[in-house]
Amino acid sequence: MRIGLAGLLATAGLAALGTGAAGTGAAAQQSGGLAPQVEQQLAHGRTVFARNCAACHGADLTGGQFAGSLKGPAFLARWGDVPVSQLYDYIHTSMPPGGGGTLPAADYGALAALLLAENGGTPAALIAANSAQSMPPAPPPGEAPSLGLPGITDRYPFPASPPLVDRFAGYTPVTEAMLSNPAPENWLAWRRGHMGQGFSPLAQITPGNVRNLSIAWAQALPAGATMAEPLVRDGVMYVFGFGDQVFAFDAATGRQLWRYNRQLPEDAAPLSKKTIALWGDKLIVATSDLHMVALDARTGRPAWDVAIPDSANTRSNGGPLVADGVVMIGLASQRDGGSIIAAFDAESGAHLWNFNTVAQEGAPGGDTWNNLPNAARHGGSVWTSGSYDAETGLALWGVAQTYDTGPVRDLVPGSNNDGLYTNSTLAFVPRTGELRWYYQHMANDQYDLDWVFERVIGDVSVNGQPRRVIMTGGKEGLFDTIDAATGRYIDTADMGFQTFITAIDPVTGRKTPDPALLPGRDRDAVFMCPHAGGGRNWSPSAFNDATDTLFINARDTCMELRPRAEGGFFTSGVDVYFSAPADSDGNFGILQGIDMAAGEVRWEHRRRAPYNAGVLATGTGLLFTGAMDQTVMAYDQATGAELWHSGLNGVPNASPITYAVDGRQYVAFVTGMGNPLAFGLPNFTPEIPLPEVNSAAVYVFALDGE
């Protein structure tokens, strides 16, 4: 199999594991003293090598016409002193070319063991993905051939390669000041900065030239559900990919700078995440096996790795917030007793505190669970990252509802069934975990209409005066504005599609559901809007401080809750079914601009295919988002008019971002269908099939000729 010279040089020998073998692949036999299972693994490695690798690398591993030597100084110049687990990871990910991971895990372990042995090492135990043993030492500088490849003559010198930009030269630590007010060219945190606004002041791309956007570069990501919003810092893009792989790319060209591949245990299913976080010289990652890992932002090497305490039977879908030197992470769960938010020191990884998102007996708020014991209290998941207000010094987190609706539906006399802290905003002091205040947006949620989403911090005109506020909305399309310092209620804006809230207290903001729409086994079927899988949902909003306008997309769907004699999706005894609204015109995608000072919708744009990506706003009056029909588009912030669109080879699944490198502005989208909006909603548009092959990629656009 012919492969490019660049690939041969990059791998320093490992280049073509995986073509049909043309030889026996005889390798040096090991001397006695090895454990029988290790001898068996080496024998298996020779068989696998002969079958898959020898045709390119030579039967004796010394190289062939198309691939280099896998033993000796040239090979060890690249792989000497490296943990065998990294060699295993490389082979597993990259070999055979174009088919990485297609061999059994035992084959990859056997190949890594063979390469260790052929380079003078002695396998101390069976080699696997997590082996701690290292390769033999690298040769002294100058003793290894510069290329180490067969089939290349030194008759004529190679021309000089184009110079590569060192994006990490002069790296300076990321500070709280940077995260709270990022430089225009950077996208440093989820929603760009700690304010959670999803807004960039960059001005090169405008309503007048946005039609000239075209692909600047693209990079494949591991196939699978991918919804993480990339980060960009000084020309480096960081992306979390499926299977807990993290990438650093040159943000101007897409050239990979490094990759981290988490070796997950067999019982840990890989989960998509919404974000990763930068702090100091570290990139903080929440893993699917419920660890927090700090990677060196320049190399991808782990700086610390700690398990999240009290995380059994939880999952990590959101992503970390790092503020005031503290890493915070929320977890999702339906376990007894509810879920948690955990905190760690950003420099050392030392655990600082846990907070129970379901109030416990005897604790503040513990008397709001209908007299239930702790073990019978459920929910309070946190599957979205938080925000941080540097003015108040408070970290702001949203909490979801409880699926266990039955035990709290009907009030026990003398009790309270609000169910704190479900559907609440929590304001913490990051270093201590002190809960400074909370505000519950929707008490006793019987419909799975979470308020767990982003907390947007901004200054909005209230009674003619600017006021520091927090804005957030639930699935029902109601957006509350509360005071950033105290959590006191200010106002609610309504997107206009919910049908079950009949009153909102103007002083407290408490919402009153229509009692006729309370679902249960003892009642008739209930029809209401929106559906828990529709409405405003996983895709976050964007906010323009200068115009007091919040931009949000939603899905115009409703639900029928049907009673069951036994069981049910909700423990109140009902199953949930999707439905179109009674007066639907078949346009299920909604995009709105909401005046948060007036509490009114300024404009609305509708389309057939539901939106799937979050919203990005820019200082030139543009909005970017994406939809289920594999389309990304730009709109005018003032009117909602569509100005540009482009097709992609996958469903845009994360929020778009924008950044600049060397004076050129880029807009990036991540594909990789997998957030919950892809469940159920495609049935509303059967003529728009979702991709059968779930690939993932980063697509980066820029203006032609810039």
Residue spans of the language-model regions?
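Short, conserved, GDST-rich strand-edge loop motifs in beta-rich repeat architectures
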Residues: I329-R335, S339, W397-G419, D556-S584, ...
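Flexible coil segments in periplasmic/lumen-exposed cytochrome c-class electron-transfer proteins
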Residues: S31, G98-H194
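Extracytoplasmic beta-rich repeat domains
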Residues: A218-L231, R259-W279, D305-G319, N356-S385, ...
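Gly/Gly-Pro-rich "capping" loops immediately C-terminal to redox-active cysteine motifs
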Residues: E39-Q40, H44-R46, A59-P96
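Blade/loop signatures of beta-propeller domains
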Residues: L149-I215, T357-P364, K511-L517, A580-P581, ...
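Repeat-blade elements of multi-bladed beta-propeller folds
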Residues: W187-R191, A223-Q245, A268-M292, R315-G338, ...
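The canonical Cys-X-X-Cys-His
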Residues: G45-D60, L111-L115
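Electrostatic cytochrome c docking/interface patches
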Residues: G25-V48, G99, Y171
